[in-house]
Curated annotation (Swiss-Prot):
Family: Belongs to the major facilitator superfamily. Sugar transporter (TC 2.A.1.1) family.
InterPro entries listed in its UniProt record: MFS_dom, MFS_STP/MST-like_plant, MFS_sugar_transport-like, MFS_trans_sf, STP/PLT_plant, Sugar/inositol_transpt, Sugar_transporter_CS
Disulfide bond sites: 77-449
High-level lineage: Eukaryota, Viridiplantae, Streptophyta, Embryophyta, Tracheophyta
Effect caused by changing residue 184 to A: Reduces affinity for glucose 3-fold
Primary localization: membrane
Gene Ontology biological-process entries: cellular response to glucose stimulus; hexose transmembrane transport
Disruption phenotype: No visible phenotype under normal growth conditions.
Residues passing through the membrane, by range: 19-39, 86-106, 113-133, 135-155, 170-190, 204-224, 285-305, 320-340, 350-370, 389-409, 428-448, 453-473
Any GO molecular function: hexose:proton symporter activity
Name of the molecule in the record: Sugar transport protein 10
Induction notes from the record: Induced under low-glucose conditions in pollen tubes. Down-regulated by glucose.
Length: 514
């Protein structure tokens, strides 16, 4: 490409800049994406630990007792215990609060500082859990883990979106989701192994959460900060040199000027939380709220949190329940590669819509199989064939999520906010995600006890609603530079009424279309 040239790209009217994909930016994004290991490891570890007999005997003897003595005459209510659910869900309540603190630190001190705080809090929380002697220590550890997750999830997707060139931003950003799936799979494998230990297997499972935390802490020292963040803090020359380095080009004037324009606009914003409520930011506000809500209401964390518990509820043995969780973890990780391949080739909308249809069908089928075997009484049994079918459809469901709502739930909110509201937008994204993750974690086992197999129909109906929402209201953002999202909203049939002309930056583009 000739020096200084830029061309229009499909998928929303944005343009690409000079420079290509460098080994430096790929390595940087890989290290940063390890922040997803924090989230993924915890998602995978808690369900396996809460199904371990030694753990239940020590901390939740009433649950272990009701399982052994079969006090409940329904399989649906076998694990229904609020304190047990609080062990899982408390992390996400802390993450919700931490995400708001992280947004301020991310803006004032850079993305790296937030990533460091996240890793350190997660490390301390892992040690609390590994050496816990009572439920209070467990909950304190989980709250510290939540602070780590809140900071990491607020800063890492923003960091990835700002470092990556627009044409591969989707693939590199999905590295965060890939790290989450790797963390889930590793946690499932560790749970399967530690369940064989005579003693303290649960301590090993919880303590090994320190490993991704150490990676995050070390990575935060190694990584450079983003040009966007440097400009926000007045380091213009350093920002330009970093932009040249990550783009592998000497002439980055057009992109650098757009970044400067965005930073100047951001400096005029004294309160991003107030400004994000303005009408011109309405699309970003809606999607930063709706996408994480819908992501959680798919029911995916029913599988991620409680896979071993769910499979034991349905009559799988201890080994079979843990191995089934490993299988879903493998499917989750491998399916994420589909998204990495497809997101910048076929766009975000196609993956959202296909994944939604796939999840809807699978939720209906799983609910129907469970209803046919257990009915409303919950006193039936699973045949091996039925168990295999349920596991198969859960795997297809997980695959649909893993190449659509899983990675895109983090990617799209991180790429649609202009710089002046980006920390606030990402904080909303993370906090809404964490709030509904908390609700699912805290009340799923109770909902299963009361709604029985109908719970899967409930999740299916939510998937149908969110798929229609995406079809009508989300424009394609493939190949659109972050600072040019105003053009995309301005061209959309519904959102254009909220976007004034002066909200579109980059006036030196001759290829603007209406």
């Amino acid at each position: 490409m000739a020096g200084g040239a830029f061309v229009s790209e499909g998928g929303g009217g944005g343009r690409s800049y000079e420079g290509g994909v460098t080994a430096f930016v790929i390595m940087t994004c890989i290290v940063a994406a390890m922040g997803g290991l924090l989230f993924g490891y915890d998602l995978g570890i808690s369900g396996g630990v809460t199904s371990m007999e030694e753990f239940l005997t020590k901390f939740f003897p009433q649950v272990e007792s009701q399982m052994k003595k079969a006090k409940h005459d329904t399989a649906y209510c076998k694990f229904d215990n609020q304190m047990l659910q609080l062990f899982t869900s408390s992390l996400y309540l802390a993450a919700l609060v931490a995400s708001f603190m992280a947004s301020v630190i991310t803006r004032k001190h850079g993305r790296k500082v937030s990533m460091f705080i996240g890793g350190l809090a997660f490390l301390i929380g892992a040690l609390f859990n590994a050496f816990a002697v009572n439920v209070s220590m467990l909950i304190i550890g989980r709250l510290l883990l939540g602070v780590g997750v809140g900071f990491a999830n607020q800063s890492t997707p923003v960091y990835l979106s700002e470092m990556a060139p627009a044409k591969i931003r989707g693939a590199l950003n999905i590295g965060f989701q890939m790290a989450i799936t790797i963390g889930i799979l590793v946690a499932n494998l560790i749970n399967y192994g530690t369940s064989k230990m005579a003693q303290h297997g649960w301590r090993v499972s919880l303590g090994l959460a320190a490993v991704p935390a150490v990676v995050m802490v070390i990575g935060s020292f190694i990584l450079p900060d983003t040009p966007n963040s440097m400009l926000e803090r007045g380091k213009n020359e350093e920002a330009k040199q970093m932009l040249k380095k990550i783009r592998g080009a000497d002439n980055v004037d057009h992109e650098f000027q757009d970044l400067i324009d965005a930073v100047e606009a951001a400096k005029k914003v004294e309160n991003p939380w107030k400004n994000i409520m303005e009408s011109k930011y309405r699309p970003a506000l809606i999607f930063c709220s709706a996408i994480p809500f819908f992501q959680q209401i798919t029911g995916i964390n029913v599988i991620m949190f409680y896979a071993p518990v769910l499979f034991k509820t349905l009559g799988f043995g201890d080994d079979a329940a843990l191995m089934s969780a490993v299988i879903t973890g493998v499917v989750n990780m491998l399916s994420t590669f589909v998204s990495i391949y497809a997101v910048d080739r076929y766009g975000r909308r196609l993956l959202f819509l296909e994944g939604g249809i796939q999840m809807f069908i699978c939720q209906l089928l799983v609910g129907s199989f469970i209803g046919a075997r257990f009915g409303t009484s919950g006193t039936g049994t699973l045949t091996p064939a039925t168990a295999d079918w349920i596991l198969a459809f859960i795997c297809v469901y997980v695959a649909g999520f893993a190449w659509s709502w899983g990675p895109l739930g983090w990617l799209v909110p991180s790429e649609i906010c202009p710089l002046e509201i980006r920390p606030a937008g990402q904080a909303i994204n993370v906090s809404v995600n964490m709030f509904f993750t908390f609700l699912i974690g805290q009340f799923f086992l109770t909902m299963l006890c009361h709604m029985k197999f109908g719970l899967f129909y409930f999740f299916a109906s939510m998937v149908a609603i969110m798929t229609v929402f995406i079809y009508f209201l989300l424009p394609e953002t493939k190949g659109v530079p972050i600072e040019e999202m105003g053009r995309v909203w301005k061209q959309h049939w519904f959102w254009k009424k909220y976007i004034p002309e002066d909200a579109i930056i980059g006036g030196h583009d001759d290829n603007n279309t209406n």
